[in-house]
A protein has these predicted regions:
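A glycine-centered loop/beta-turn motif at secondary-structure junctions
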Residues: 186-224
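Beta-strand-turn-beta hairpins that frame and shape the catalytic cleft
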Residues: 17-19, 152-157, 195-200
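Pocket-forming structural segment of enzyme catalytic cores
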Residues: 121-192
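Cysteine-nucleophile active-site neighborhood
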Residues: 77-153
């Protein structure tokens, strides 16, 4: 399935190479603008010369075998419950793809379920698929507000967090970044998100990728190298992005 954005086809001839982006559970895990990550990534890949196909996957669908990047968003606890059985049905495929180097971006609720488990505030335990060495505990208050963080890989990352889950990383992964404004994974260690293989997990909504093109470029490069063995980036004018980032960093919490 090829989507269009703003009336223009995402897929148009350029370098003759195609990247296929899969959006996980858009019906149940698409909140706070997370679908914008897929749209921004498609646009960015197109700017780098790729044809792009965007595919949806919802519970009960046949999981496609020939995708290059996987994106998953956040949702309410009820949405996590709805998808849990199906997520475990495809969990082995997702884990193998992650271990094989497929780039993935998972936000908030799916970030939690890519870990070992999520213990909800109501006492229910939702088992994760154990791609990320982390567990999450439901907190008593929501952590809401603008967030700024520093990453060794991506520089300054800006976004918006809105979660009550408190996530704690194990030794098998690294944090995505260190929080300079906001809370992040939990209220104690100043870490935010997680990195393992080519998987990026984070609590940042907003959407994340329009304001953080370095992460988009990372996902695109990883996918291109994995599929074609090479990546030649185009020079992209990010002047408007930099203005948006500067504005976001000045916003109050």
């Amino acid at each position: 399935m090829t989507h269009t954005i703003a009336g223009e086809p995402v897929s148009s001839p350029n370098n003759g190479k195609t990247l296929r982006i899969l959006q996980l559970y858009p019906k149940d895990m698409n909140i706070y603008g997370d679908w914008g990550n897929t749209l921004a990534l498609a646009r960015r890949a197109h700017a780098h010369g790729f044809d792009v196909e965007i595919l949806d996957y919802n519970p009960g669908d046949t999981f496609p075998d020939d995708v290059d990047i996987i994106i998953g968003g956040g949702g309410q606890d009820s949405g996590q419950t709805v998808i849990q059985e199906d997520l475990h049905a495809i969990g082995a495929k997702l884990k193998k793809n992650a271990e094989d180097g497929m780039p993935m971006l998972v936000i908030c609720g799916l970030y939690q379920l890519f870990g070992k488990e999520f213990r909800t505030h109501e006492g229910e335990t939702l088992k994760g698929i154990n791609i990320v060495d982390a567990y999450t505990v439901g907190g008593n208050e929501r952590l809401i507000g603008n967030i700024v963080e520093d990453s060794q890989e991506f520089g300054t990352i800006v976004g918006f967090e809105n979660h009550s889950g408190l996530t704690y990383l194990g030794a098998g992964c690294e944090p995505l970044a260190t929080v300079t404004k906001g809370v992040g994974n939990n209220s104690t260690d100043h870490h935010e998100g997680a990195r393992v293989h080519n998987v990026v997990g984070t609590y940042l909504h907003g959407s994340l990728l329009p304001k953080n093109p370095k992460i988009s470029d990372y996902l695109i490069e990883a996918a291109a190298q994995r599929k074609y063995g090479e990546f030649t980036p185009e020079k992209i004018d990010d002047s408007m992005v930099e203005k948006a980032r500067a504005s976001a960093m000045k916003r109050p919490r």
